[in-house]
Amino acid sequence: MAKKKAFTSLPYLASIVFLPWWISLSFNKWLESWVTNWWNTRQSETFLNDIQEKNILEKFIELEELFLLDEMIKEYPETHIQRRIHKETIQLVKMHNESHIHTILHLSTNIICFAILSGYSILGNEGLFILNSWVQEFLYNLSDTIKAFSILLLTDLCIGFHSPHGWELMIGSVYKDFGFAHNDQIISGLVSTFPVILDTILKYWIFRYLNRVSPSLVVIYHSMND
């Protein structure tokens, strides 16, 4: 019976893992030309936030200062410097334009992907139920020592001493995937907040659920943790 459930739930599990990647790849290619054409036609400034505007101004000022310094050292004529500034400004505008296109593209793709996955989960309720029952049966058959070791390993990975670097990479990757500009302050705030929230949830879960369901597991977990 357990093997039958495992084989039945494997296609559903594989579809959950690979479907988001396939949807993202397909819709990225399909939407790219449409979003590029829409953005270049509308020239909308809706998605220009204060952080992006500040970054562009800083880059432009830095660029101008570098060219002026180069002029003082090499004694270039003023017209030559102006041409270089004009050329680099156009390049900066192109980069800014492409950044906005990628932001809209990634955001649109993620929204579509989330909607399709939500519909798939609702329609595939039977497969989700079989997968859930198989996972519960698999976990139930494990010994308390293995369960305690697994919980300890996961907690050390997620909220341990070395976890902030992993959280920083993961949050930065998600932030980039949604097309937003990199912001150290926001990422640092999330990195310092998420592990604390997870630690609180874990302690509450151990206190409310594990103490009632498997007291021996809690004893083994605390012994390993100490």
Curated annotation (Swiss-Prot):
It comes from the Eukaryota. InterPro entries: CemA. GO terms for biological process: potassium ion transport. GO terms for cellular component: chloroplast inner membrane. Pfam families: CemA (PF03040). It is a multi-pass membrane protein. It is found in: Plastid, Chloroplast inner membrane. Its main location: plastid. It catalyses: K(+)(in) + H(+)(out) = K(+)(out) + H(+)(in). The chain crosses the membrane at residues 7-27, 111-131, 186-206. Keywords: Antiport, Chloroplast, Hydrogen ion transport, Ion transport, Membrane, Plastid, Plastid inner membrane, Potassium, Potassium transport, Transmembrane, Transmembrane helix, Transport. One of its GO terms (molecular function) is proton transmembrane transporter activity. Belongs to the CemA family. Contributes to K(+)/H(+) antiport activity by supporting proton efflux to control proton extrusion and homeostasis in chloroplasts in a light-dependent manner to modulate photosynthesis. Prevents excessive induction of non-photochemical quenching (NPQ) under continuous-light conditions. Indirectly promotes efficient inorganic carbon uptake into chloroplasts. This is Potassium/proton antiporter CemA. The gene is cemA.
